[in-house]
Structure formats: C-alpha cells, structure tokens
Amino acid sequence: MACEVKHCGEIRDFKKVQEYFGLGHDDNWLNAINHAISPTGELIAMAQGEKLAFLSTCWSSHGNGNTYVLGWCGELEDPNQIVTSLTCLPMTQNKSTDGAIEWTCVAVGLCSGMVTFYTDSGVKLFSQCCQEDPVIGVKLQSAPRHSEADSLLYIIYPRCLCFIQGQDILPTLNNCRHNVQRGALERSSYPTADVVPFQKYKFKQEREAVINDAAISTTQRPPTYDYIVQQTIGLGYFAKVHATPPRSSQVLAAGAEPYLGFFQAEEGYKTMSLGEVAKDVIGIAYKNLLGGIFRRAPEPLPSPEESPLPVPTKEAPMRIRCRLYDGKRDGLTLSVAPGGRLAVVTDNLDRVMLVDTHQAIILRVWKGYRDAQCAFVPVKEKSVRGIKTHKRKALFLVIYAPRMGCLDIWALQNGPKVAAFNVSKSGQLMYNNHSPLGSGGSSGSGNSSSQSRKSLAINHCLFLDPSDGSLKEIHIPFHYALSETSSQTSRDIHMLRRLRNQLRTINHGQAKDEALQEIGELASELQTLEVRQQCLEMLLKSKKLQPQVFQSIINAFIKKPLSESTGSEEFVNQIENYKRLTDLYLALSQANQREDNEPPVEYLELSDADLVTINKLVLLLDDGTEKDKPAATREVSFKLQAEHKTEEFVDYLSIFNIDSPDGISLLPEKSDKFGAVSIDLFSQFFAQGLCFGQFKQWINQACLPSRDLLKLIIWFWLEKPFKYNNCDEVVEDMSRIAAMVQTICDLAGEHIHDYAYNAISPWWQEVRELLLESKQFSGLLVAIVCKTVATNLWRNRKEGSCDESSQNEDDERWERISHDEAQWGLLTGKLEDVAVLGAILSKPLICRDPVGPEMSYEPPDCSLKSIVSSGKGIVTELTAKWLISAQLHPSKVLEISPPENELDDESKVKIKDEPTKESVDEDAESEEDLEMAKEVYAASKEAHEPILERLALLRAHFPFSLESGVLLSLMSWQYMVQWSKQLSSLDHLKAALLCLNQFRTPDWALKHGICCMLWNATLKFPLQAAAKLIQKVGRLPVDKMCQQDLEMSAGKVPEFLELSLEFLQHFTASMEHDKRELHFEQSLSEGALPLQFLALQQHHAMPQLLRLQTELCSVLHFVSFFQLRIPKPLTTLFDSMSNKALLADINKELPYVLPAPDLVLQQQRTEFLCRLVTATMDLIREDLEQLYILDHVFYMGKICALADSWEVDKLPILRRQVVELYAFGYDAEAQVLLQDISDDEELGRLLLEIAGRRLNLYAQSSQSTFLKIASVGHQLLAYLDNLKEPMTENNIQIAATKPDEIDVAALDRLLSHAYKYLCRRESKQLPIIGQMYNAVRILQN
C-alpha cells in the first residue's frame, strides 16, 4: 500500500465556468478567483469580482466519484461590491440522528465588510456587516465531537475578529430558508433577527502591523497551571487569578509586524472585585437619591415587547500572549490542523513553518516552497479484518508548490517526506477543517442527541486539477507515520515491497524453483499480522497470480506462524483453507495418466429412447465444421491449460467461503463463476484419465463437501462445449461423468439415502433444481446421467435391504418406480423439449427462397427455468422470431394436415359420407396412410427445406404452441412492431400483410383479434397523422412535411395508404368468424399472458367504424396516388359526426347514431368520384399498338367499391368513364361499357360534343373539307363555332390534336350511339345530330 493521488470527482462544466469569469485564455485562472469546497463534497463555490458560480453534484453512471455540474451562476445585487472570501457550510438538522446533510450554505465575504449567505441554489438568505473593512476570510471553528461546546463562526477583518455563535446563526439561516421555500413575503409571519448577535475582538496593533490571515486554534478552557503562568507573565506581580479560568479562544494571526501573533480572546463577563462592587452600589444609591429630591422617578426597565433587536456588544481588545517579529518576513497564509494543536504558516521568503499552538513555538521549517499551499491530512489506523485493535491516529502535512508542480507529503511532527507527486502547475490545494454546522455541540439540544449521531466523512484535503477538470484526493496509508528504525510494521512493509518486486520479475530470466524459494523466504520474514493480511489481499487482487506462487507463500505462513498473543486464529483458519484449496487445484490440474490398477470406466447403459434423443441433439448441433478435426482440437485444448492459470485461479479461490474453521463451502452469490472455474479445474483430470482412488484422497484432504463438489462437476459438464461427431463420443463422455458422480456419491456415504421411503431425495432434488437453470443442451445429458446413477443406487439399496424378502411377486410387479424416479422422468421429458428448442433456435438459418425484410436475431436463453416460467406463449414467440429471421414465406408455416380444431366442414362431410360398415381401426389406418402420403408429397415438393424439417421437429414437441394460426399471429405482430419503429420501412408492413393473408378460416378469430391489436398499437396513429396532414394541405404534402409528421418521404405515402387499405380489408373480412379455443402444453406454467390469448380477448370491431376507416383510407389513397387537389377532403366528403367517429376506438360502440348523408354531401362525393375516373385515364398506356388498360380497370373497381360503400348512384361514374374513354380515343373499350347504360340523355349530349370536337378538328385538314361540312346547314356550323369558344369545367377536351388522328368511320359510329340516347326524348339537338350525320356521310363518300 503506497500513497496515491486518487481521482474522486469530475467537473463537467469546468470550461464553462472559466469562460463565465472571462478567464478563458489564462491557464492559471484559479489563482485569480476565490474558491471553496464543502467539507462533505457536495458543492464547489467560485467567485471572481462580483460574479458567483456554484457547482453541485449530480448522479453519473460512470464510476463512483462525484460529478459536478454548474448548478447556478449569477452576480451580486450591488455591482460595486467585490467578493474577497468564500466558505461552504453544510447544514444538518437537530433531529437528524444520522447526521445527513440537508442543504449547504455559502458564506460570501465582500470588500465592504458585508457577509452574505446564499443557499446552494443561489438564493440570497441573509446579510450582515460587522465591520466596515474588507473581509479577509470567513471560517468556522467546529466543536470537538461529543463535547458540550458550540461551533463558532468567525469573520476576519484587517483590525478585528467577529465571533458568531453557531446556536445564533443556525436558526436564522434555517428560518430564512424556510421563508424562501414557503414564498412568505411578510416577515411578521416568520420573525427573524435583523442583526445576529456577535462579539467583536480587536487586535492590538503596534507600529505598522498588517494582518493577512488569522485562525482560531482552540476554544477550550485552558488548564489552570497554564492560565496562572499566562496571567503572571502578562500582568506581572499584581495579576488577579480566578479559581476557574475563564473560557477563551486562542487566535493566531499571520502578517507583518509581527510575523506571527498569539492572542487570547476571552469570552463572557469579567469577575469584579469587592471595591468595584461597592463603587457601583454607591453610584446607584446616589443616583436614586438625587432623583427623589428632584422628583424624578427611576428609569423603568424596558419591556420585552419594546426591547430593541440584539446589537453587538462593545468591541473588546484581545490580550496578547506572544508575538514573533521578523522585519523581512511576512506571513501569507495560516492553516490549523484538526484538533488545533499544530498550525502551518507560509511566508514571502519561500518558507513553510510548523507551529505548536499550545507552546507557541516553531517546530520545523521547510525551505524552497514558493507560493506554497498547505493542508493537514489526519489518518486513522485500519484494523485487520476480524481482529479488534485500538485505532491509532497520525497527521500528515501536504505541501503543494505550484511553481515546481509538485505535491509533497511529510510525516509530522519530525517525520520524513513519505511521498512526492508531479501534478499540474495551475492547480489548487483545497483544505477544510470544519464539520457541518448543526452537528456536534452546535445542535443546541443537549449532548445526548449529538452523541447519537454518526460521524460524517470529511474531505480535509482535495486537489483541484484544471488540466483535466477533475478533483483528486490524497490517500496516505497509516504505516507511513511509523518510525522506519524501530517499527516492526515498517520493516514488514519494506519486506512486502521486496516481495511485490520479486513477484513482478518471477518470469524474467530466473529459474522458477529458485524464485519460488526466495518468495517463500521473504513471506516467512513477515512478522506482523497486519502486513501478512495485506500480503494475502494483494495476492488475491492480482489477476496474474500463479498457483505455485500462492502455494509457496501460504506454506511459508504456515511453517512460520505468528505468536498466539496477536489474536490470529481467524487468519490461521483462512491460511489453512487456502492451502487445502491450492493443493486440490494443483493436484487436479496436474493429474497424470491413470494408474494400472485403476479399473476401466464402465460404459453407461442407456435406454433406446435416450439414445434416440442424444442422436437427435448431435444431428441438430452438427454444423459440419468439426468433421475434419475429429479429436485433435479437444486434446490440444487440454494441453494448453497448464499455461493459462492466472485469472482462472483467482476466480477459483474467490468462489469459496474460507472463513469457517470447519471446512470449505461454495458461495452461492458467486454462481456466475462456477462454470469457468469448473472447466479450468477438471479439464486436465478428465483428459488424462480418471484416477478415482487419488481423487477421493484429494477431496478428503481438501475438506470439500460432496454436495459442493457435485455442483462443480455438473457445472463442468454444462459449460463444456458440445462438439461431438457421433453418438458414441457423447456416450463415452457421459460414462466418465457417471463414474465421477458415482464416486462423489460414495464419498457422501449414507447422507444420500437420508430420506423417508418413497419420498423425494434432498440430494438429487438440489441437482434437479440446478439443472432447471441450465442454459446449455448438456443439461439433458446430465439429467440422463444423474437419473441413471440415482436409479442404480436406489435399486442396489433396495436389493440389499432385508425387507425385500418379505415382498411378494405382486408387489414387485407394481412397485417398479419410486417417487424420485418419477421426478427424474418428468425432468428429462421437459429438458428434452427445451434442448430441442434451444438447439434449433440457437442457429439462425436463411431459407432457400427468402421472402421479406431482414431482421436481427439474437439466440434466446433456452434454459428450462426461463422457458417454463416465462408464460405459455414463450415458445410461440421465440419460434416466430426464428422464422422471421429465416425469411420464410408465411404460406410455408401452414401445417401439411390441419390440426383437429381446424378441420373444415368439407372434411367433416366426407367423413360422414363414408360407409359405416368399416371398423374404427380401419378408419384410423386409412387416415394415417393419407397423412403419411401428404407428408411425403410435401417433403418432395419443398425439396428438403432445412427450416421446415426443424419446424416439424419442434411441432412434435410443442404441437399446440406452434399451430399455424398462432405462429402467423406472432409473426404479423413482430413485423408490425418493427415497422412502427421505422415507418419508412414498408417492407415490414408488407410482410405483416402477407402473414395476415395466410390465415385459415378456422383461425379467423385469431386474425380478427390480432388485427384489433395491430390497429390500436401500430396503424391507428400514423393513419390519423396522414389524414390530418392531407386535410391541412388538401393534396399530397411535400417531402419535408411528410418526413416531419409521418417519418417517411412523400413518395412512400401512397404505398403506405394502399397497404393500410389492404389491412383494413383483411380486418373487415375477418369479422365473420367462429369461436376459437387455445391449447397449451402442460409443461408451460402461468406467467405473462400470451399474445394469442390477448388477441382472443379483444372486443369485436364495430362494422360502422371499420367501414368509416376503410372509406377514409380509400379517399386518402386516391388523393395521394392521383395527386389530386381537394381543399379539406375530410370535411368535404364526411360529415361532422363521421369525423368525430373516426377518432373513436374501433372496437367500442358509438354513443350516437351516424346520420344518413344529405344530398349536398352525396353530390360532393359523386363529383369526387368522377374526378377520380378522369384521373384513372392516365393509367392507360399504348405501346406498339397494344393497349394496357388493366390498371385503369383495377382502380375503377376500387372507385365503384367506394361508391357502393357511400351508396352513391354509379350512373354518373359510368357516364364519366365512357365519356373519358371516347375523349381519349378508346372507342372500342367505351363501346363495351355502353351496354350497361340504357337511357341517359346527358350521355348523348356529351357524346355529341365529343363528335363535334372531332369534326371541328377534321375540318382543319383542308378548305374543301370545311366547305363540305358548311354546305350541310347553318345550324351545324353555328354549333361547331360554339365549340371553338374557350373551355369551361363542363366542357370535354379530346386527346386528339391533329386531323390525321380522326377516323371518320369511328365518328360515324359515335354519332349513331349519340343519336340512340338522344332520340328517345324529343331533344333540341336532334337537328344538329342529323346535319352532323349528313356531313359525315358526305365526308365518307
């Protein structure tokens, strides 16, 4: 243990404070400011000029040190004031028994003599001026612990000191803070004193004396003898000496002329002599007599109500004890040690002087410390663990020389320099010598409460390092205060240093045996218990401790024990236990080949079912990487063990309880290290052969309980890598483990069978509980081994019992299995299921035809305990995540043959129609043949997809949890949840819809429930945001708005709305469903409710609300896809009640009835749909005389579906479609649609207009053509001229732009269709169509 400068705090806002003071370019800026830190470390105060900054602690996850942030910064109320000193005063409550700090007060001294008190949050509480001189310092003199004295707050001025009792200032500050917290504006409700009572003591200054610093060394009553000597020296022969010395405070002042002064500030009233008393009595009588003669009454005493506020008493001069003069020397700073016995003074001549304050003498002088900063560090002796010793105390002096950048530590009073550190040259050494205000004697409530408080940790000395913005503490071990020549501890410390250096160089050039011998000799030279304990702790903390080194040191301690008077019984027990552990470790790790007389390990006899299970695990976990290296890697791994026994050995020692004298036991809280330790401990033993004779001997010598040894063996198997090529290798290793378990049971003796007949064995029950938490696949193999060993032991004991002869054959026939064996059977069954589950899910696979987005996958924790206790839906959830990571198409999740609960009606009808003459057995056989045929066909069809093979294996173990409907529910949920985290990734939404599309009809109840949950959890709010955005803009928003509100680009919004519409269609289709019941495996216990159960618990969606959401989604999709501009589409196409219903929960019934749409709303909807029909024309494209019209037909189907939902007349929609097709020149497609429209005069008028526009365009081809058309009649010519006028909204624009594009024959057919619709009624346009028909005939001829 050496001196250290440890990091204990971090100041995050260090640069911010530096910039706040305007000193950002000054490296030594800390010298230009005033600073103080709370002795309990919760606050740092800094000030410069009129600026203040308070840094408070905050919680940080990095390390255990304090983290300081800027809590408050501000300026003084008076900008003309300048801060000259700072002090932090932690405050405690009188009623607090633990001494906890409630808040921190900051006392700020100003150049005007004012002292202002602030809270730690920067709120001004109270201010008082005791002397109109600059304040040199504000300090607190704490009372000794468990004393009746009171703390003393004193203010240092250039000519005087002002004392304020702690019991006077404490309630004032608490009262002011209470007023601030309550927000009280009237002081009458919370009375406080305007002036806190204080006592002023004046320095007797002669010549041109200067006071730079002062401090109180003690406030205790001086001893009688010292008091008599002081009075005699001070007053001479006629000195008056009292029987009880008055209480006085000794004040030390550093400055110039004198360099150092010792003063006495006497407290209380001075005792008067008999003559002074007689003089005062005569004066009072004379005054009263004259008052009676002149009819003047004596002055009444002031009443308590009229008495003024307390005022300071008359200043009293301090009595000079002695002074040290030095004309060239000026004292700069003064620091008093804890206890007040010593003080240190720095001066302008680069000297540091140690002063004895009681004797008033200079004890020691250090030279060469320019601008030094000093601090005292008290250190207590630490007691050895488990040994009660008297704690001694030592005092060290820390001197910081900023010019040299060094930090020196000196032992007091006459000790040497014990350490020196290089630190920053711009730092500050911060020293505190006071306790919190309110603790100790300042509580004012008696000594009983103060004695019950716990002592707070005081940071006496801290170093503020601006280079890295950190706060550092100086750690000094106690033994540095001991004498180097006479102390046995110091000698042992020196030997410990040599031992540590020897340990560092053990592997560098020196022979190992010689090094171990020298280390043992050095360890045996340690003669003190404390240093031996330190040596042991040093070894256990080392990460590179070698077993042979540790054994050598332990043997040295045992061979040369300490004297019995030192009370080292517990330490001796620890050493002996460590020796047993080390010997066992070396014996097992250095095991040689098995002896010749050792019987070979018998192969374990396993049942066929166990062999099938083992072979299944080997095939599942075989990845093909180890086939080329059958056994070489396993042997090499064991040979390398001898070179890597450093950290493993330390962990091995740490998992045992070595404090008990009876033996060694495992520590349950270190169970996380059992696996690694057991691998390191037993690997060599298993690799070199099992020598059980020596093994029993080693265990008996180590005094290790058999129960703990069995735990380590099981952990060894569980942590061992599962790398086998075939089943024979597994059985071989299982046989070794079985032999080891059998040996441990032999060591345990009859303790194993200490339980009632046919009850559960406590010995094996602990093993089963350990296997429940196993996360590896080897847990099943260990369970099989232990079950076999336990069964053999039980049967051997049963055969050897004398009661067996009395049992008859019937009893033997029925009583074949015990209760304990039944428990093993249940455990192995569960472990088999979980092992298969873990083996499959631990290896993520990608299917041959991946579908859907990639999702990250982490192999789950598949221990039996986690699977059984995580609820009934855990298997479904884990398998769904595995299937999603495999990117398997959801259609392949469906079972080859539906489960019993999913038989459809057709299969039931077929079963009923079968002949009833066949027996039940024949029916069962035919069904089994049919299923086998289906499986063979499916297997050939899927071309041996590995994922489907593993899924089928999982379904054999978990048939209910892995039904297709349940899996699809979880997969769709996982996809949608992932999409909700990143809305722009629409691939996840598509994958979820693909899962919803694969639900079978019997699973529609699950589908409807999961749709309800997905709507409320993921889709509802993005869809509402899109509706709100389109309602605001009236069209598809720009990309920036979509990114801000929808977290996706504008180009993805139409696709998102289309997918949402598809989801709502799935939602609507699943409304009609049958009842669905869920089944779970019995091994899964109750826990968190599974998702499929929550889905079935959902209320059905309301059809009206679902229809409204579908209509809204359709409108939003049309507006965004066709980029229409519709102002306020939600209020235009939906009434107010419908808009309100769109915000309601989809599975809660509305409290009102939605009204039927009025004529205006229906007209607006019709116009919107007609605009959509016009927009769909852009989807028709023509390429190489081939027309692509499927997209147009697809969206026309959607438009008609929306019209049906709105109950809008579809005739205007079909009319618009026909007209638009004719306008774009698609006459053949339009002619097909005319068959659906029987009687519509408006359609005839529009067709006539299209024909007129075509004729107008054709007339532009030549002059003769125009003359032919004009020769028909003036009425046609006038009609054609009207069509040439500017276009309006009601007019129709044709797509043709050139006369060559007009087909006269098609125009003839168009006129015939127009005439068919106009001739049914006497229309005014019949003459026009007749003349136009004649004109077309002329053009044709």
UniProtKB/Swiss-Prot annotation:
One of its GO terms (molecular function) is small GTPase binding. Residues 906-919 have a biased composition (Basic and acidic residues). Residues 432-452, 896-928 are annotated as: Disordered. Disruption phenotype: Third instar larvae display adherent perinuclear redistribution of lysosomes, autolysosomes and autophagosomes in the fat body. GO terms for biological process: establishment of protein localization to endoplasmic reticulum membrane; macroautophagy; neurotransmitter secretion; positive regulation of GTPase activity; regulation of GTPase activity; regulation of neurotransmitter secretion; regulation of synaptic activity; synaptic signaling. Keywords: Cell membrane, Cell projection, Cytoplasm, Cytoplasmic vesicle, GTPase activation, Lysosome, Membrane, Phosphoprotein, Synapse. Pfam families: RAB3GAP2_C, RAB3GAP2_N. GO terms for cellular component: autolysosome; autolysosome membrane; autophagosome; autophagosome membrane; axon; plasma membrane; presynaptic membrane; synapse. The modification Phosphoserine is found at residue 801. It is found in: Cytoplasm; Autolysosome membrane; Cytoplasmic vesicle, Autophagosome membrane; Presynaptic cell membrane. It is a peripheral membrane protein. InterPro entries: Rab3GAP2, RAB3GAP2_C, RAB3GAP_N. Belongs to the Rab3-GAP regulatory subunit family. The Rab3 GTPase-activating (Rab3GAP) complex is a heterodimer composed of Rab3GAP1 and Rab3-GAP. Regulatory subunit of the Rab3 GTPase-activating (Rab3GAP) complex composed of Rab3-GAP and Rab3GAP1, which has both GTPase-activating protein (GAP) activity towards Rab3, and guanine nucleotide exchange factor (GEF) activity towards Rab18. As part of the Rab3GAP complex, required for the rapid induction and sustained expression of synaptic homeostasis at the neuromuscular junction (NMJ). Also participates in the regulation of autophagy in tissues such as larval fat cells and adult muscles. This is Rab3 GTPase-activating protein non-catalytic subunit. The gene is Rab3-GAP.
